Amino acid sequence: MWRAKLRRGTCEPAVKGSPSACYSPSSPVQVLEDSTYFSPDFQLYSGRHETSALTVEATSSIREKVVEDPLCNFHSPNFLRISEVEMRGSEDAAAGTVLQRLIQEQLRYGTPTENMNLLAIQHQATGSAGPAHPTNNFSSTENLTQEDPQMVYQSARQEPQGQEHQVDNTVMEKQVRSTQPQQNNEELPTYEEAKAQSQFFRGQQQQQQQQGAVGHGYYMAGGTSQKSRTEGRPTVNRANSGQAHKDEALKELKQGHVRSLSERIMQLSLERNGAKQHLPGSGNGKGFKVGGGPSPAQPAGKVLDPRGPPPEYPFKTKQMMSPVSKTQEHGLFYGDQHPGMLHEMVKPYPAPQPVRTDVAVLRYQPPPEYGVTSRPCQLPFPSTMQQHSPMSSQTSSASGPLHSVSLPLPLPMALGAPQPPPAASPSQQLGPDAFAIVERAQQMVEILTEENRVLHQELQGYYDNADKLHKFEKELQRISEAYESLVKSTTKRESLDKAMRNKLEGEIRRLHDFNRDLRDRLETANRQLSSREYEGHEDKAAEGHYASQNKEFLKEKEKLEMELAAVRTASEDHRRHIEILDQALSNAQARVIKLEEELREKQAYVEKVEKLQQALTQLQSACEKREQMERRLRTWLERELDALRTQQKHGNGQPANMPEYNAPALLELVREKEERILALEADMTKWEQKYLEESTIRHFAMNAAATAAAERDTTIINHSRNGSYGESSLEAHIWQEEEEVVQANRRCQDMEYTIKNLHAKIIEKDAMIKVLQQRSRKDAGKTDSSSLRPARSVPSIAAATGTHSRQTSLTSSQLAEEKKEEKTWKGSIGLLLGKEHHEHASAPLLPPPPTSALSSIASTTAASSAHAKTGSKDSSTQTDKSAELFWPSMASLPSRGRLSTTPAHSPVLKHPAAKGTAEKLENSPGHGKSPDHRGRVSSLLHKPEFPDGEMMEVLI
């Protein structure tokens, strides 16, 4: 009993504290939820129990307060009859509504425990208000659950304010579960039915707790861990299961106790070799009181016990059960005496325990409890009986209470189960005295377990009653505090209501005055309206006249709107026509500007053509003069040749005197004549090129004049078309643009054809120029070679002159020689520009007058001819540079068509008219190897400017 008191004392401070600190099934929230809490007239326990004086005084004081104070009468429409509401005065009704608002606000924002307290106060006030109320003899929470199911449901369905998360899950679960039958509008059970149902639930929870959970390390009064309750409790216990489940559970509990205790006694007897059978009976009552007193594994509540109080223990069983009681004392309660021994005994336990996987024995390190094990443990001790050391026997005896309940096996099966033979020592073999001990122990265990169970139930009921008394004292204290706070708040609210009532009365008086003024104004308005009724007839006649005039005005307005729409459409048409004419005018002006620009360009071309014609006439006169001079020179040279030949024939006798007198003069004459011949040949080739350019320019001018005339005709036709088709100017404009495109395409094709023809002609002229240049080079070479010959070969000069006179036409042999000497014709064009350089270079080469005429003539002629060759080679670069004076940079020739910059080897040139010539010239190596020359020839078509007449005169 001392241990029970100590254990109860360990839990009482936690119970008096916050409910969440030691949340056992007997905590305030659980007590309010439990069905055994609902007892009539504050009598907590039915049957043989009595109500404590403290509880009776508290309830009587609360009821007196409720009856005396009218503010606590909470008149809800769900609780009072209509007659009772009518019987009360206006002040009581106002106070009741104020109290109802305050309680509802507190229910909305308070914690669940405070909500339950407030609801208890509310329903106590409701129950004490009416003397004829049918349920006023119930407790406050029973009144709550039976009379106001809707209020409980509303309080359970409040919006989450943050405090609901602090409550345990089972609280919320049981709150929702308690409201479900009330939602379905089912009749609530009576007190006896609710009590029986709660006791049945507690019996089921006790059995499941013994089968599936492990108790705490300390024994609190009637309390167990919430986790062990929820883990070891199957869903069958939450449903309304029948009495058959309870009977099976009791049978299972009984047989499990018998089997586990018999096995432990057998092990102890085997260890001691059957030596100790009768021990002194001192301490038996103490052992059983301590062992059977607190059962922390059982949940709060009383198992339904249809029998009376248990009978007294027979003395014979007390003597026989001394080993068991000592074993229980050592096995059950060494958690208080030796807290370290549990860890030492449980840790070296090596054998696998065939227990449920959801029950962890060492999860929270609690001490073992009586009658707590897992349900599906089948034959748990064959493995432990094979361990024969004293430590293993202590371990098995210590862990026996943890796994003392097996499946419900009958007693003969438990006794007749074949035990595995021990393997270690022969001293522990089973003997006949051991079987007798086992039988006596089993009988003793049956009696003790039954009476122990009854004692457990009784003691648990006392613990529950004590806990409930504590909870009721706390609840009453809280209810009194809440009542005082409600009284204060209602006094404040009444003062506010009085102030508001005064304010509203003043407002009502003001509105009465305002209403009176409005009625007066309404009467005056009615009088004025009645006086003006006779004037309404005249107004109606005037309105009819005005309506007829309005109709006429509307008709006129419609006509004017139609005319305005027609005028707008006409103005839009005129605007479109004006825009079209403006566009045509702008196109015509652009065309005129374009034609003026073309006219300026063509005038510039005409001026250039006139200048070129003047230059051509000058060139022709100069050419005639040069031809005359060439004739004179030729005749004079022929005469000198004849004279020299005659002298050579006849004057062999006097060879020494003639060279002395005639050698310097002859050398001067030969050098001048050669220079003159070379300059004339260069001028001839240049003027031939200028003539070709002039002819091409004239051809282009004629083509441009023809295209301008054609454009003039087309523009005149287009203007006449625009004038004649002025109405449909858009279509005419589109057609005109198409015609312009077609005309431009035609002009482009014509210009391309003319350009191709001109390319062919230019190529032909270029070939002729090459031939003439080559012929002039050959003539110059022949004259040089004839002058280099000695005096005896002078007749060959005449022969060379004859061949030169005969080679005036273009032959195929000259073309073949042209291919061989492709490099020599480049320098002949620039000899005119290189004449000064030739003179300056040949002057120092003149030797002093030699002794013999032949040697002096030969040396001088060789030097001059060699310099002529080098001058032609050196002046090739100068020719390319000086050609830029006559061949300016490429630019597009201004004309309406597109001029192709196609070179001579392009396939565009190979039309039938010029195909043969182009192929000849492309096959010739001279034409293929000089891209500069081809570029110059093709750039003839792109020269915007040509050399002026002044430059021509300078060149002449």
Curated annotation (Swiss-Prot):
The modification Phosphothreonine is found at residue 902. GO terms for biological process: actin cytoskeleton organization; angiogenesis; establishment of cell polarity involved in ameboidal cell migration; hippo signaling; regulation of cell migration; Wnt signaling pathway. Polyubiquitinated by NEDD4, leading to proteasomal degradation. Disulfide bonds: none annotated. Residues 197-246, 274-322, 382-405, 411-430, 773-823, 841-880, 894-944 are annotated as: Disordered. Residues 259-279, 438-639, 665-694, 729-762 form a coiled coil. InterPro entries: Angiomotin, Angiomotin-like, Angiomotin_C. Keywords: Cell junction, Coiled coil, Phosphoprotein, Tight junction, Ubl conjugation, Wnt signaling pathway. Residues 852-866 have a biased composition (Low complexity). It is found in: Cell junction, Tight junction. GO terms for cellular component: bicellular tight junction; cytoplasmic vesicle; cytosol; plasma membrane. A motif (PDZ-binding) lies at residues 953-956. Its main location: other. Residues 282-294 have a biased composition (Gly residues). Residues 382-398, 802-815 have a biased composition (Polar residues). The modification Phosphoserine is found at residues 241, 269, 295, 720, 793, 805, 828, 900, 906. Signal peptide: none annotated. GO terms for molecular function: identical protein binding. Inhibits the Wnt/beta-catenin signaling pathway, probably by recruiting CTNNB1 to recycling endosomes and hence preventing its translocation to the nucleus. Belongs to the angiomotin family. This is Angiomotin-like protein 1. It comes from Homo sapiens. The gene is AMOTL1.
